[in-house]
Design a protein with these regions (language model features):
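Charged, amphipathic alpha-helical linker segments immediately N-terminal to NTP-binding catalytic cores
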Residues: 1-48
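Conserved nucleotide-sensing/catalytic segment adjacent to the nucleotide-binding pocket
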Residues: 34-43, 92-160
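Pre-Walker A adenine-sensing motif
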Residues: 50-59
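Loop/turn-to-beta-strand initiation segments
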Residues: 64-65, 123-125, 179-183
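Extended hydrophobic secondary-structure segments that form protein cores and membrane-embedded regions
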Residues: 67-72, 184-187
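Glycine-rich phosphate-binding P-loop
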Residues: 69-86
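Conserved small/polar residues in nucleotide/adenosyl-binding loops
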Residues: 191-201
Length: 201
């Protein structure tokens, strides 16, 4: 697959602005023309080698950090993607954190508190396997988590979700202004997810 074809394919699945973007308008199973398993493997190997060199520069300069956020449903391939893509980097410069259900200490603080604690230092790459987006996804589906957070009743309601999204956007903008590049990777299709789960069960 030629580089320009890959760039065009990536442009179709890359979101640079949330304005007028809806996941339902994009087929997560779409495969770019000319992409085969062999070309994908070759591109992955090239990308891993390039990432390794970029990581060395990132570490040596010590001014920027990179935060890769993987947020998707179970069986979406987050673990496998992290394992394969990061296989060629120096593990001393990478921290992977998987966010599980919040514990008592985390519930006693604001919802971004546990995220702040895991941010990568300058010169390093941080990877979040699940993230602060859990607070507008899982918490919405499991109100008992929200109840356990002890938020004053006057702050609850529909406005809470809008406020949290604003807080997340502000948090990520702040990180960018402090020299932390935030890269976000979301979603696979439900059909792909069902297929992956059926292979395990």
């Amino acid at each position: 697959m030629k580089k320009r074809h890959l760039q065009r394919a990536l442009a179709n699945i890359t979101v640079t602005s949330g304005k007028d973007f809806h996941l339902r308008d994009h087929d997560p199973a779409a495969v770019p023309p000319g992409l085969t398993a062999e070309t994908a493997e070759a591109r992955l190997a090239d990308g891993v080698a390039r990432l390794s060199k970029l990581q060395e520069r990132l570490y040596a300069q010590g001014t920027w950090s990179v935060l890769c956020v993987f947020q998707a449903i179970d069986a979406a391939g987050k673990d496998g993607t992290i394992k394969h893509v990061m296989s060629g980097v120096n593990p001393q410069g990478v921290q992977v954190h998987s966010f599980k259900a919040p514990g008592a200490d985390e519930l006693a603080h604001d919802f971004l508190w546990r995220v702040w604690r895991e941010l990568p230092p300058r010169g390093h790459i941080g990877i979040f396997n699940r993230s602060h987006y859990e607070e507008v996804l899982v918490t919405r589906l499991h109100p008992e988590i929200l109840q356990a957070q002890g938020i004053p009743p006057s702050l609850l309601g529909k406005k809470l979700w809008r406020h949290r999204m604003e807080d997340i956007a502000g948090f990520e903008q702040y990180l960018g202004r402090q020299g932390c590049l935030v890269l976000k990777f979301f979603q696979i299709g439900r059909a792909s997810c069902r297929e992956r789960v059926s292979l395990v069960v």
